[in-house]
């Protein structure tokens, strides 16, 4: 829908670069991006999560992020790729908004941190209690586990809860604007 065309006009290049390079401070996002860059493949749920994160947490325009991922997927199929991107980024106006929480996804799909530790070696010594949110480690633990947050591995570049709240307000506002009955 054209109603959504200009909602993400202020493209944040720094967020885009961090997302592309697996440097967001969200371990599963970073592991997926690094795995994709190295192998050309990640499963459907992880693809959906990457799009959700780029679209809602980073508020990046789906047209730019979709072009980048199209160059990374070895199984790229335009007819599937672009329609999925539009749906996952909430710009169709007909699908419900699907926002994936990267910490919850990691707990559900990499509960032991095996995938994350493989693709984000900076976190290989981080214990399970912090593998989902390494930025919550104390400075002492960061030293013990050889992972200084902000130096070896980034702080989360955005606050997931805050960004999702903003995204929902904007997107639901557009939906209400175009679905509310007109005054008589």
Question: Which stretches of residues belong to each language-model region?
Answer:
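Short, flexible active-site recognition loops that position polar ligands and cofactors
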Residues: 150-161
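Generic, well-ordered alpha-helical scaffold segments in large soluble proteins
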Residues: 31-35, 49-57, 68, 72, ...
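C-terminal, helix-dominated tail/subdomain
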Residues: 57, 68-146
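Short acidic alpha-helical/loop segments enriched in Asp/Glu that coordinate divalent cations
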Residues: 1-2, 47, 61-68, 79-84
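Catalytic core of tubulin tyrosine ligase-like
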Residues: 167
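Short acidic (Asp/Glu) and glycine-rich catalytic loops that position anionic groups and cofactors
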Residues: 7-13, 46-49, 93-100, 143-149
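Conserved small/polar residues in nucleotide/adenosyl-binding loops
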Residues: 178-184
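Gly/Thr-rich phosphate-binding loop signature of adenosyl cofactor/nucleotide-binding cores
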Residues: 1-48, 57-60, 88
């Amino acid at each position: 829908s054209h109603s959504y065309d200009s909602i993400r006009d202020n493209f944040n290049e720094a967020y885009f670069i961090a997302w592309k390079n697996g440097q967001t401070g969200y371990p599963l996002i970073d592991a997926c991006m690094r795995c994709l860059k190295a192998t050309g493949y990640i499963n459907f749920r992880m693809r959906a999560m990457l799009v959700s994160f780029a679209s809602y947490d980073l508020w990046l325009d789906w047209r730019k992020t979709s072009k980048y991922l199209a160059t990374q997927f070895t199984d790229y199929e335009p007819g599937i790729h672009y329609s999925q991107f539009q749906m996952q980024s909430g710009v169709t106006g007909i699908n419900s908004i699907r926002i994936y929480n990267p910490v919850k996804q990691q707990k559900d799909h990499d509960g032991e941190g095996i995938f994350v530790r493989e693709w984000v070696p900076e976190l290989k010594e981080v214990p399970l209690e912090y593998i989902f949110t390494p930025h919550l480690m104390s400075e002492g633990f960061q030293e013990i586990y050889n992972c200084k947050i902000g130096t070896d591995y980034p702080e989360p570049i955005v606050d997931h809860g805050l960004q999702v709240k903003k995204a929902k307000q904007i997107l639901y506002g557009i939906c209400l604007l175009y679905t509310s009955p007109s005054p008589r």
